[in-house]
């Protein structure tokens, strides 16, 4: 269950932040929350769970998600990462370049097919 894992990760990050209040802790795991990730991140930052929201795979699928969030807009669901992990499969191959096979398929699907199948 992905949401159980996300909850476990975020509460663990919150414990680390509480234990080290002078160290800015960056979250992880927000990609699983898709278009709701910005709202969850904002609430967690407000409540002191972590200092900054970290987006990894999401930025490969949706490179301008930070701009969307800062503009006060909800991220577009059809641009969000679907957490398929194909980007990490490509990255782990020799000479692999991470990218979103789903959202940028014109570029990364041929690479994925060549290197991962």
Regions inferred by a protein language model and the residue ranges of each:
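Flavin-dependent oxidoreductase catalytic cores
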Residues: 1-117
């Amino acid at each position: 269950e992905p949401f159980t894992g996300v909850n476990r990760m975020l509460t663990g990050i919150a414990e680390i932040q509480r234990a080290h209040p002078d160290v800015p802790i960056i979250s992880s795991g927000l990609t699983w929350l898709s278009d709701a990730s910005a709202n969850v991140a904002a609430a967690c930052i407000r409540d002191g769970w972590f200092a900054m929201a970290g987006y990894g795979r999401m930025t490969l699928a949706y490179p301008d998600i930070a701009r969307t969030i800062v503009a006060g807009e909800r991220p577009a669901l059809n641009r969000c990462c679907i957490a398929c992990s194909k980007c990490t499969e490509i990255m782990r191959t020799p000479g692999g370049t991470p990218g979103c096979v789903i959202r940028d398929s014109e570029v990364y699907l041929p690479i994925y097919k060549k290197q991962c199948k």
